[in-house]
């Protein structure tokens, strides 16, 4: 329904469980099945991430998911923030041109620590992969996040909703307010 109703690209989250980003072979099959469903509905792409027990990217699973996602845009989601080494993760992801976006808050820490990391990631990613800054981005900090990180893309969650409610309706007025703060 969404794909037919809007003219913006839609990427669908592929995440079989919320408890972790480490997945079993059964989870992999569920994810591949879901990716096929995304293709059938005509969405622009998928959003997923997969880690191993040592909090590194699970390369074997990633390659299987990328194979299943052929023809779709791929975003590596905030599992990225769980990595023990974000820069190493970025380098690995850049080896896979099928991944064109990383959704990240810059890992753990306060706003200044995360902003510094995000700035480094944006600079190192260059044009190879888009860094989509998300997680804690609000209408109150988005202008400073843009300035501190040199980021160009931001993922807004509850700040775009009525009463700042995660499950509330999207507020066009709030989106205009946020866009104004970004100068767009």
Question: Predicted regions span which residues?
Answer:
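Alpha-helix-loop-beta-strand connector modules within alpha/beta enzyme cores
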Residues: 1-18, 57-78, 115-138, 172-184
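Catalytic cores of alpha/beta
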Residues: 20-37, 81-97, 118-127, 131, ...
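Histidine/lysine/aspartate-rich catalytic loop segments that bind and position anionic ligands
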Residues: 71-112
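Glycine-enriched alpha-helix->loop->beta-strand junction motifs that scaffold or abut catalytic
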Residues: 6-9, 42-45, 68-72, 94-101, ...
């Amino acid at each position: 329904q969404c794909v037919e109703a809007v003219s913006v690209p839609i990427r669908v989250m592929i995440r079989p469980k919320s408890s972790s980003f480490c997945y079993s072979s059964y989870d992999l099959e569920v994810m591949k099945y879901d990716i096929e469903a995304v293709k059938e509905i005509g969405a622009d792409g998928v959003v997923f991430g997969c880690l191993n027990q040592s909090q590194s990217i699970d390369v074997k699973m990633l390659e299987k998911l990328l194979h299943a996602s052929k023809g779709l845009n791929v975003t590596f989601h905030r599992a990225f923030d769980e990595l023990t080494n974000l820069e190493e993760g970025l380098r690995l992801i850049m080896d896979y041109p099928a991944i064109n976006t990383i959704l990240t808050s810059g890992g753990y820490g306060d706003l200044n620590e995360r902003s510094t990391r995000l700035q480094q990631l944006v600079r190192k990613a260059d044009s190879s992969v888009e860094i989509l800054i998300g997680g804690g981005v609000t209408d109150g900090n988005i202008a400073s996040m843009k300035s501190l990180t040199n980021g160009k893309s931001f993922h807004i969650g509850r700040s775009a909703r009525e009463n700042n409610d995660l499950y509330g309706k999207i507020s066009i007025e709030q989106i205009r307010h946020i866009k104004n703060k970004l100068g767009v």
